[in-house]
Amino acid sequence: MKRMFQFRFLLPAGALLLAMGAAIPARAQAPAPEDLSRGVARIGLMDGEVSVRRGDSGEWVAGVINAPLMTDDRVATGQNSRAEVQFDSANVLRIGGNAEIHLAVLENGRYHIEIARGTVTYRIVRQSQADIELNTPSVSARPAHEGVFRISVTEAAESEITARAGDVEVFTPQGTQWIYAGQTMMARGSASDPEFQIVNATPEDDWDRWNQGRDRALQNNNSAQYVPPGVAGTEDLDAGGTWIYVAPYGYVWRPTGVAAGWAPYRNGRWVWVNWYGWTWVSADSWGWAPYHYGRWFFDARWGWAWYPGGLGVRASWSPALVGFFGYGGGGVGVGFGFGNVGWVPLAPFERLNPWWGAAYAGGLNRGMSITNVNVTALYRNARVSNGITGMAAGDFTAGRFAGVQRVSGAQVQTAGAISGRLPLNPSIASRRFSDRAVTNVPRASANTQFYSRSGAAAGSRPAGNSPAQPGYHRFGEPGAPSQNARPAQTQPGNTVGQRQGSLQRFGEPGSSQNAPRSGWRNFGTPGSSSGGRQPYNPPQSRPSGSGSGSSAPRSAPASRPASRPAPKGDKGHK
């Protein structure tokens, strides 16, 4: 028989009163509807120096693979470094060296990214309904469908947008302009009234070829066929384990190459993330999907296996899928009467008691209940010889995870199962993804102004603007050169990447930021052919097992105008 709330150690008065009124564990809850708008991306790959500026604390921390990213986070890379940010199973952003991006809006299916400097490539791998904005200091770009879109922003805040595959619509307060596959738009000036010209696409280089290799890894994803819709990070599972059939669950995934005594939720650390609270950051190379979706179980033949859930229901992301409890003595002042905190992975169909969201925000013990139980009787995986993990509660909150260890069933025969918000306050160290010191803190870019299609003030071009520099044109000026018709196909062997007039590429030796350049104009002017170009040929790859490989880029409708005035409801800058 359960003994409800018989603490052997003194609780803070407020916690004790709350606990006495909540002796029965809360019924399992699904995340509140507003939780689903709190999108989470991840660092899926990194090489070199990668730093993250936490939007909740403002601190720069060292990036790690599988680090969760949220709205207002920034990602910066050092010299000769690169990173990949994965938003879902279809949308990824790759960041080159000496670059910085800001996740201005990150909700489920809504990704607005500001590119402060450097070169990035946004890749839509397969069909996606996501609302995507790629904002630069001058313009806002919105991809139309699957494709490959390269964007560079120079130190002088000039922008270069290249459609390698697919089409992208570019927005300004004065109107919009299409960039078709095989074209590059060069834009400069303030977000209120930028200038641009369209030229042949920049030639492919090592950055593009590296991106093509990453595309193949995403497209040749055998694991995608075994997981429900909405699960990201499955491409990492192919190299990290195998899929096996285990009744009654069906196909499940088991990791290979793990150390003896390995268990889920042991190789990594707990990090405090805004809104979601304590979030598991795995040090396993494949450790995104199996720790934020589905359940784990232990099979006598195969060992630990991950059950991704039913294929017919779209999966929702969770910061972790475990049961928390306190155990052992010495917990005075910790906040819940125990000296240690433990956790166990939830088994298939076991209920999840969320500790995050609006219901549990705003106070140390708000929405919390603790029940004295035998943990091995409460959780199936607690009966596995190495299923329980624990550590000192003080080390947990201080971000010291070297002491994480296996916990025996005998140690938790009398423990306090926690339901609701965890009574463990984060420290500054709790917001860091690793013990590594950050080595790349970029110059301040928080004051850089970006144009956003969705968040800027309606308005036409301000009166009294100064005339364009010699050789430049502004959007809407009579007689501006027209450049935005879909370019004609070129035959193999034609020269590609040639700039029109005397224009040089951004950053080319000898180019002058102030020198007059021909061909610049303003949004809203009529379009005509921009000359020859070489079409982009996406890398060939076999379809994934789920049949969700990338489709060929679609052409824009013939009736779609190359440019049009700004739609009503466009708002000003931010």
Feature names for model-found ranges:
Residues K2-A13:
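Bacterial N-terminal signal peptides that target proteins for export
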Residues M186-K574:
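Low-complexity, repeat-rich tail regions
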Residues P12-G21:
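Bacterial N-terminal signal peptides
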Residues K2, A28-A30, K571-K574:
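Short, intrinsically disordered, low-complexity terminal/loop segments
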Residues A28-E169, P173-T176, Y180-T184, N211-R214, ...:
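Flexible, surface-exposed loop/linker segments and immediately adjacent secondary-structure boundaries
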Residues F7-F9, A28, P543:
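Hydrophobic alpha-helical segments, especially transmembrane helices
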Residues A23-P25:
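Juxtamembrane cytosolic interface motif at the C-terminal end of transmembrane helices
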